[in-house]
């Protein structure tokens, strides 16, 4: 189900709770909402659709990927950039990393670890900021 985009900064500033297997329908809604906004959006966190759970979805080189309970294990190559967000107006300056190593769970809640770089690393970090209640 495609959901409305949450623009409530007080809600967006809350840290997300860990995702559980019963949150799979939320992930499906998140993915459907992301695809519906694909012309202006490459990633979303569950709080962007009004659910404070640690779930992100984004477009990668291999298609769309959903991560449950993602965390950054390692990061390198800090730099400053400017980003926009469907939940916020305009663009804002923020710090990002050239390379990040991420641990997450897939839709079967099996652990995964992968290193991402460039644009994909930026997207993941932006969505993880949402999960951590950080507003760019």
What feature does the model see in each segment?
Residues 1-136:
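Positively charged
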């Amino acid at each position: 189900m495609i959901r409305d985009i949450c623009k409530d900064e007080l809600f967006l500033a809350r840290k997300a709770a860990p995702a559980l297997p019963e949150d799979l329908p939320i992930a499906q809604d998140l993915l459907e909402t992301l695809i519906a906004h694909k012309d202006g959006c490459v990633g979303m966190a569950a709080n962007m659709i009004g659910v404070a759970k640690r779930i992100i979805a984004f477009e990668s080189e291999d298609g769309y990927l959903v991560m449950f309970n993602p965390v950054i294990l390692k990061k390198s190559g800090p730099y400053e950039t400017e980003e926009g967000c469907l939940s916020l107006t305009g663009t804002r300056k923020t710090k990002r990393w050239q390379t990040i190593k991420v641990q997450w769970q897939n839709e079967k809640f099996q652990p995964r670890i992968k290193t991402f770089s460039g644009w994909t690393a930026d997207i993941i970090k932006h969505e993880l900021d949402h999960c951590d209640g950080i507003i760019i």
